[in-house]
Amino acid sequence: MPEQFLSTPEALTREFYEWERRGRGWQVWHQPVAIEPPFRPFFGHFTSGAPGAVVDDGRRPTFLTQLVDGFWKARKPLAEAITPYEKVEPSPLFIEEQVSLVEMQAVLPPETKITKDAAGQFLMSLGDVSRPASFEIVGTSDSILVQLASAPRDQRQMREQLQAYFPEALSSERKRYLEAAWDRSGGKCTVVVEYGLSKEFMRPLRCFERFDPDPLAGLIGAMATLDPDELAIFQVLFCPARHAWAESIMRAVTDGMGEPFFVDDPQVVKLATEKISSPLFAAVIRVAAQSPKSARAWRIAEGIGKSLRQLSDAASNELMPLSNDGYDEEQHRDDVVNRQSCRLGVLVNRDELVSLVHLPSA
């Protein structure tokens, strides 16, 4: 609908979603990008059309409900008028240089249990890496390996922190293991699927207080029945978010008086507060599979994807497989091995990320 025909609640709701969707991991660009979404502050809910636009701090219905003025409660405006601002959408940072990452494979001795606290502290210790790290579970008919890949300049830090938080882990450094396992000749059918957030990114995924049973157990189990010449990969590219998302998140879900922006979904304020209760990360969550048969490659990828359903919270958020429309197929295949992405990452907090990025218990 043309903007001049939108009611005020419709215009403000649309403005909210234009800002919010950047954090869901949906957007695809024509070349690899930095995975943290380009940041634009959310200053508050007001119309930005005519000069002297009046601040309207009424609470609005969600995007999926009817947007009608009857939902609004009349309130005294916070201010008589504001100075309109011009929204300039920043472009992502495009990645021109490819870096061959060093892989560190790690395994825990039998009966070793990983705590959520140790796994979370390990993630936080990687805050100064020069480029996103990659957590990977790679399955073949012979083995299932867990590895962390990082830029050569970050490898020492990765190794030291891994030893500090998981001294019992047995680790070894390798180069090009994934590249050697990944078929680039076109002789195998390849499926690559990324997962994004289904709902507003400030709604957190289900988080686990304990890793007993391990959240990754189902995913690893889905790789246990691979045939020869088949490959399965679960890959998470991740890095700490650098921008001040927390402040904008709270301004986006509240009106100017601190009340919920969405009158029929006041719970979103509590959920957003939970989201920013631990540091935010950008992450590309990816599943890849290869097999001589296309149908089989899809079944492998779907089997891994089903294991991600345990992160779903019906009252909050869930991961959903994303369309590859606009993502060049050859580029997509190369991005798996190069640990890069033409798709922006999702914004998740540490507690959400650690459910997916940790050494699985033996």
Residues covered by each model-derived region:
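Extended, folded cores of ATP/NTP-driven motor/assembly subunits in large transport
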Residues: 1-362
